[in-house]
């Protein structure tokens, strides 16, 4: 059985479990948790970088699945993508709450947020190359620019929220993001035009 076929069967099983969960089947939710929680937990842990918080948020995700399984729409994406979207949203909410509570932001390694969800070994290799290239591009940024961009694009904070978290004027945050994005565009241009393989 090919990896692609195996993944398709897996997604079909998860979709069936979500449907049964929507009908109130607790055993289906338990099975869904057993099958998918390692991926969900892994994504949340990458965002929060705190095992205990990631465990709590993972449980929150499956509580949300129990309550909202009927909202899953197969036409809008795979069951795995839906679960990861819920996980990412919950993790970002927790990150924002923690950053607001502590009034600061922990060190950020934006490149670590490029989780691999490749279907084939070729896609995995391509993803690794892309992550390496993005890491190199991020290295051209100042620490301040990298931090502001990570908060905006990976953690979903608004520019006002970033200014508040970093205790900086809004204009400074906007400048850091704008200049950082210009540098990133220049650094990523060879990759986008296919000059880098």
Residue ranges and their predicted role:
Residues 3-6, 22-30, 41-60, 191, ...:
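Short, charged helix-capping/linker segments at alpha-helix termini
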Residues 10-14, 101-127:
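Internal acidic/polar
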Residues 22-23, 49, 60-76, 97:
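Sigma70-family region 2
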Residues 26, 33-51, 68, 84, ...:
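Amphipathic, Lys/Arg- and hydrophobic-enriched alpha-helical face
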Residues 44, 96-99, 141-146, 175-197:
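Short, Lys/Arg-enriched C-terminal cap helix and immediately downstream tail that follows
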Residues 56-63, 77-89:
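Structural recognition of an alpha-helix C-terminal capping motif at a helix-to-coil junction
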Residues 132-147, 151-172, 183:
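Helix-turn-helix DNA-binding module
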